[in-house]
Design a protein with these regions (language model features):
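Gly/Ala-rich beta-loop-alpha elbow adjacent to hydrolase catalytic centers
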Residues: 94-102
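Conserved alpha/beta-hydrolase
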Residues: 40-62
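Catalytic nucleophile-loop/oxyanion-hole region of alpha/beta-hydrolase
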Residues: 58-86
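N-terminal cap/lid segment of alpha/beta-hydrolase-fold proteins
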Residues: 1-17
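The serine-hydrolase catalytic nucleophile loop
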Residues: 29-41
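The alpha/beta-hydrolase serine catalytic core
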Residues: 4, 89, 109-163
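Short beta-strand element of the alpha/beta-hydrolase
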Residues: 20-28
Length: 163
């Protein structure tokens, strides 16, 4: 039976019987922590628990935390620290944007297993591609800070610098 908890501001769910090993499951854009259930069904019998969190702005989170790396990465680092206090062995299972954020949150940390699906590994290249599609130069983005583009997204100089 899943156990619903909160780690800092992050809603989380823990799957599996107590174990010495745990995966952090980080969903992608428009996902949610419950996506971890299928993965947990595979690894729980192998002696791994699965802890999954909702990224900022997902699954009804209305706590004001935005899905930007300077807010999401420290939140995932807090989850990582929570895990290090409770499990001897850590793994990461992450999807797309969640993979990029998780890799930053776990930089320099020992991870026994790292399973990434459709990982976004080069955020800078992706943002530069979106700039080109929108016909926006880096100089204009630097000057304006943020520029809304078709499709409901906003290009951000701060985000590009972070990447």
């Amino acid at each position: 039976m899943p156990e619903y908890i909160k780690i800092g501001r992050a809603p989380a769910v823990l799957y599996g019987e107590p174990a010495e090993r745990a995966f952090l499951f980080v969903h992608g854009l428009c996902g949610n922590k419950e996506e971890a259930q299928r993965f947990a069904a595979v690894v729980n019998p192998l002696g791994w628990q699965v802890l999954a969190v909702d990224l900022p702005g997902h699954s009804g989170r209305k706590d004001g935390v935005r899905l930007v790396p300077w807010e999401a990465v420290p939140e995932l680092q807090n989850v990582r620290n929570y895990m290090k206090e409770r499990w001897r062995t850590l793994g990461v299972r992450a999807v797309s944007l969640g993979a990029w954020l998780a890799l930053q949150a776990f930089a320099g940390e020992r991870v026994e297993r790292c399973l990434l699906s459709s990982p976004l590994l080069d955020m800078e290249n992706m943002i530069c591609g979106r700039l080109a599609q929108a016909g926006v130069s880096e100089e204009r983005l630097r000057a304006e800070g943020e520029i809304p583009v078709p499709g409901g997204q906003t290009l951000s100089w701060h985000y590009l610098c972070w990447a």
